[in-house]
């Protein structure tokens, strides 16, 4: 490719602009903002003997753009030639035919493992969300932010504990927690 030339869409784009899995990439510091709230909540889970597996924290806007529009093209909700450009993402969504454009977008959707329409802007793109799986916590007691303990009889009991830290569960999205529950 020469300077200024765009690269065709396809699964090769999925490894670019990776989503972070690091709490350090969330907004804020240990004392105040979302990062600090998450750090304290995770520390409480681990102190109780639970385990945490993080699948996503900060998602670069470029990745959100690629996910959002690849899914829209794949589902036939937008034509490849109607996708707005994004600075810093030199992708050419348009292939020789609309069918090939859609096929390339479908390859991206499959590689991203997209199930629901990804948001162009989300709590992840501003560093205010975490996707995580919590294990080994049922039957244990976890400290709330005020120091009292809550018995975790079933995993959903952890939602109220998270809320005390300002880490709010989005019920409809199993791994998703954020600063506002969205």
Task: Report residues per predicted region.
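Cell-envelope/glycan interface and biosynthesis
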Residues: 2-171, 175-181
């Amino acid at each position: 490719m020469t300077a200024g030339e765009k690269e065709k869409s396809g699964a090769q784009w999925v490894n670019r602009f990776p989503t972070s899995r690091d709490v350090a990439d969330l907004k804020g510091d240990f004392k105040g903002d979302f990062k600090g709230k998450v750090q304290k909540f995770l520390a409480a889970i681990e102190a109780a003997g639970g385990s945490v597996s993080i699948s996503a924290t900060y998602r670069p806007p470029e990745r959100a753009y690629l996910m959002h529009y690849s899914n829209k093209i794949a589902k036939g909700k937008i034509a490849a030639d109607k996708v707005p450009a994004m600075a810093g993402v030199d992708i050419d969504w348009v292939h020789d035919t609309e069918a090939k454009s859609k096929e390339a977008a479908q390859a991206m959707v499959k590689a991203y493992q997209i199930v629901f329409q990804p948001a162009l802007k989300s709590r992840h793109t501003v560093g205010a969300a975490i996707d995580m799986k919590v294990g080994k916590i049922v039957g244990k007691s976890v400290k709330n932010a005020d120091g009292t303990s809550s018995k975790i009889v079933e995993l959903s009991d952890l939602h109220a504990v998270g809320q005390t830290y300002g880490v709010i569960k989005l019920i409809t999205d199993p791994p998703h927690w954020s600063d506002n529950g969205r």
